[in-house]
Amino acid sequence: MADIAQKIRNTREDFEERIVEIRRTTKVTKGGKNLSFRVLAVVGNRNGKVGVGVGKAREVPDAIRKALSAARRNVFEVPIYNGTIPHEIVGRQDAAKVLLKPAAPGTGIISNGTVRAVVELAGIHNILTKTSGSTNPVVLAQATVNGLKNLLSLEKIAQLRDITPQEVIYGVKKEG
């Protein structure tokens, strides 16, 4: 029980919220058409924590509340080095692929709107992205999240290669 309370307190941090998409959906039944709304929301602290959530309801405010609540529940940490990601990675979800590449300082965020919302709120300032396949914002956001979740920190990369983090950044000097 204490773990749940701690998780709720953690979600009360100063997260910035962004609504990426509000889509009206219609279900046709024997009695007519039932309207509802689907909302895609992103929350992040611009310091390495970000979450994405989807909410569905008959009214827009209820859908927004559900989406923001789902996004706060799905917050995770992103390794960031010098305002960018440590290495190139591809995130996949269903028919969507998102290529995330580190960029030099001053490059900015080169991306489409959905991916931009996720990486901006994660706190990444310089990144190159390329999307292919599905252009559905929900699927693109989930593909971006999958890519960011699979990033390795500099320390983890150094440990796997059996070198120091400085050698990962600046390269290993060749002898001879």
UniProtKB/Swiss-Prot annotation:
Domain topic, free-text comment: The N-terminal domain interacts with the head of the 30S subunit; the C-terminal domain interacts with the body and contacts protein S4. The interaction surface between S4 and S5 is involved in control of translational fidelity.
Stretches assigned to the S5 DRBM domain: 15-78
GO function term, MF aspect, one: structural constituent of ribosome
One of the Pfam families matching this protein, by short name: Ribosomal_S5_C
Assembly, per entry: Part of the 30S ribosomal subunit. Contacts proteins S4 and S8.
Keywords: Ribonucleoprotein, Ribosomal protein, RNA-binding, rRNA-binding
Keyword Cell membrane: no
One GO term of the biological process aspect: translation
Name of the molecule in the record: Small ribosomal subunit protein uS5
InterPro entries membership: Ribosomal_Su5_D2-typ_SF, Ribosomal_uS5, Ribosomal_uS5_bac-type, Ribosomal_uS5_C, Ribosomal_uS5_N, Ribosomal_uS5_N_CS, Ribsml_uS5_D2-typ_fold_subgr
Function description: With S4 and S12 plays an important role in translational accuracy.
Protein family per UniProt: Belongs to the universal ribosomal protein uS5 family.
This protein's GO CC annotations: small ribosomal subunit
